Amino acid sequence: MEYAHIMPEDIFKNPEVKVYVEAGNSCLGALGFTEHGRPHAKRCSNYARNILEALDYDTRTCELAAIAGYLHDIGNTVNRVDHAHSGAIMAFTLLTRMNMPPEEIAIICSAIGHHDEKTAFPVNAVSAAL
C-alpha cells in the first residue's frame, strides 16, 4: 500500500486541524486557561522539532515531532481531563484519513497520549521532545 508523506505544513494548513485546535482553545478559555490556540500549537511544534534537531535526530523524526507538537492539545476539544488520550485518538483518526503510514501515526499518537503533565512518560524521542 502506498502512503502519503505528510509534512508539518500539511497539518498547519489543514482546515479540520484548525477547527480542533481552536475548539480546544475555546473550551480551555471557558475553564480559565491561558491561550492554547494556533500560536500555542505552533510554538510547541517548533520547540519539539528544534529539540530533536539540536540532538541530531534524522529529518523525518524532527518532522514527526513538529506534527505531534502541533496536534498535542486537540483533545481539549473533548475535555481537559484525559485530553492527552482523547487527543491521541483524534490524531489517529485524522492522520489515518490523511493516509499517513501506520508506523508514523504510532509515534505521533504515543507522544500525544503520553504528554499529560500528570502521566507523562518519554516512550520515544518524539514524546520526550514534546
Where are these regions (language model features)?
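Alpha-helix N-cap/helix-start motif at coil-to-helix transitions, marked by capping-box chemistry
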Residues: 11-18, 35-42, 59, 85, ...
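Histidine (H) residue identity feature
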Residues: 3-5, 36, 40, 83-85, ...
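Non-catalytic interface/linker regions that flank or bridge core catalytic/transmembrane domains
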Residues: 1-20, 27
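Active-site flanking loop/helix segments enriched in acidic
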Residues: 18-53, 70-77
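Divalent metal-dependent catalytic cores for phosphoryl transfer on phosphate-bearing substrates
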Residues: 30, 54-130
